[in-house]
Amino acid sequence: IEVFEKTGLIYRLDRFVWELAVQKLAQWQKDGRDDLYISVNISTKDFYYMNVYETITSLVETYKIIPSTLKLEITETAIMTGTAGELEMIERFRKSGFQVEIDDFGSGYSSFNTLKDMDVDVLKIDMGFLRTTRPERIERSMSIINTIISLTKTLGLSVITEGVETKEQIDKLTQMGCGIYQGYYFSKPIPVDQFEDAYM
């Protein structure tokens, strides 16, 4: 991925992945599984090389999927550095029925400014908060996570905590009010056919 980013070809890889995701969603929905969704990443480079809105909405229309089942992950940094046009495009996605997720929330220096300036649907709390090993840092990190979770409730947003690896973390996060988790505690990344065999 780093090579694709350095050469400016990441947008081609992203578009390829978007189409694969939409194709899979179309298959699932044809089989009656409207409850499943896939999150895809949008990088800053994508905005430079193509009309992201037209590309994604065209795929959704071509394969006739429910827009809300294709969730769009945009990093906090990408939103912070985005142009007015790019931020407007993100809002167009929301108006068209897509859900926008801020990925790696809390990794930047202006996290709360991001929330002030941008309407989104989901915050994904950066896994760095759970990777702290020093006891005094763990307590501080969990306090920050608790604050973010409380904030999402006030703003009416959903929240996902990334990097969950232990039952203890699950228990603490559940007490704080987080109900959606992502991490190796559940599974490492697996091929889609293996996912279907295990969970469908």
For each of these PLM feature ranges, what is it?
Residues 26-30, 95, 175:
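Regular, well-ordered alpha-helical segments
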Residues 43-50, 69-84, 96-200:
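EAL-family c-di-GMP phosphodiesterase catalytic domain
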Residues 2-3, 132:
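PAS-family sensory/regulatory domains
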Residues 89:
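Conserved functional hotspot residues or short segments at active or partner-binding sites
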